[in-house]
Amino acid sequence: MDKKELRTLIKTLKKQHSKESLLEQSQLILSKLENHQSFVEAETVMLYSSLPDEVDTHDFLERWRNKKRIILPTVVGDDIIPVELSKETDFAIGDFNILEPQNEPYNGNYDLIVVPGVAFDKNGNRIGRGKGYYDRFLCKHLEVKR
């Protein structure tokens, strides 16, 4: 099975789950993240603003935006441009119907990068949505925990 077929299969499987099930699974996953040593020790964390079929990060972002330096991606052309989330940050709908922070680009370091994915294997390898945004971004930050 190639990546395109796997994405199609997973999309079909996701449709079998309710919104409530997704929220329950999201809370479980994000609770594990909150307690993970890499997150606990991190000062600067890149997260993502979730799409409806992804682990729901919206409440998580609100909970942590004033406790850690939270960075969110914005998409400009073919690239991810990281932006720091602050108390005053406004959001706008981006190219893919994703809420994106409206702020200056962040050019600092990261302690942890959390990325969305269509699927992950036991070794942490991921399949994204096929556009390569995170692949290109992560290649520039190989030293950062993910």
Where are these regions (language model features)?
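Surface-exposed, charge/polar-rich loops and edge strands
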Residues: 1-5, 12, 104-113, 122-125, ...
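N-terminal active-site beta-alpha-beta segment that forms phosphate/nucleotide-binding
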Residues: 1-100, 104-108
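Glycine-rich nucleotide phosphate-binding loop and flanking beta-alpha elements
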Residues: 53, 120-122
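Redox-cofactor binding/interface segments in oxidoreductases and associated redox assembly factors
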Residues: 47, 115-116
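Charged helix-capping and loop-helix junction motifs
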Residues: 129-134
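Short loop segments at secondary-structure junctions
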Residues: 86-88, 118, 141-143
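Short amphipathic alpha-helical segments
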Residues: 58-61, 125-128, 139
